[in-house]
């Protein structure tokens, strides 16, 4: 059996999390929020952590906001910071729990495109839980679960 420390290290290495509500720490800048998982894992130097945090924020169009705190951003921007934070330790799997549940339609589309890019550009596996039928229709694979039981397993047909 793994120790608590080993389980924590495995989570930090293998999984990134995006929640319905961003759970960014309000007293910290965007840079500091994105740096937190890297600091917890302890794999990179301080300079490498700050460089990676800056690169991730820039990749999501938030580079100029890096010194701001979350309350200075829109809901969609905060959720993009949450996605950047989920990628901080470059995990192979991103778990997204209702990632667009608290967003307007424009921000929902932007966050969905980010999640899609995580798969197509970054080669990540994204496991998303959503009640948004339109969002679910765009996923490569959909598992429809009702009362804890798998009701349907559908795969999107990609034409060559």
Feature annotation, model-predicted:
Residues 1-138, 142:
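ABC family nucleotide-binding domain
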Residues 139-155:
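H-loop (His-switch) and adjacent beta-strand-loop-beta switch element
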Residues 157-159:
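A short acidic/small-residue loop/turn micro-motif
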